[in-house]
């Protein structure tokens, strides 16, 4: 309504925000494989390269799941594992990512793991999440 009142072409705006079907299916497949950890963390792992943008969008989307405070997507790219992390306001994914050698900000962060697979990184991620909450207590 705001955009229409401001004179925007809402059909054009809608078209601008549409997603490619293949990318949408890929995001949904990532999300479908997600598991909860510590009750409020969603962790998804994919064994195929999906790109940083798609992984980040899947992590963003998982925050819309009731009870999820932070989300993590592990994916391979160019011979290494990558992490894309997102959160609301209760979990600082920057701190978790920095503990893993990455960075970002409180709500959007990531890390790279040269020479590692996503399966290698998964237990390390869980241990790091545990350490984060132990330090917060």
PLM features per residue range, with description:
Residues 1-137:
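Hydrophobic helix-and-loop "lid/oligomerization" segment in the mid-to-C-terminal part
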């Amino acid at each position: 309504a705001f955009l229409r009142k401001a004179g925007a072409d809402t059909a054009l705006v809608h078209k601008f925000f549409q997603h490619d079907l293949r990318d949408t299916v890929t995001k949904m497949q990532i999300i479908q494989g997600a598991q909860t950890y510590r009750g409020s963390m969603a962790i998804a792992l994919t064994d195929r390269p999906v790109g940083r943008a798609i992984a980040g969008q899947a992590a963003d989307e998982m925050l819309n799941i009731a009870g999820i405070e932070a989300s993590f997507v592990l994916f391979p790219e160019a011979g290494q594992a990558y992490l894309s992390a997102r959160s609301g306001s209760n979990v600082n994914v920057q701190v978790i990512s920095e503990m893993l050698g990455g960075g970002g900000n409180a709500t959007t962060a990531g890390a790279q793991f040269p020479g590692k697979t996503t399966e290698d990184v998964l237990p390390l991620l869980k241990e790091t999440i545990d350490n984060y909450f132990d330090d917060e207590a």
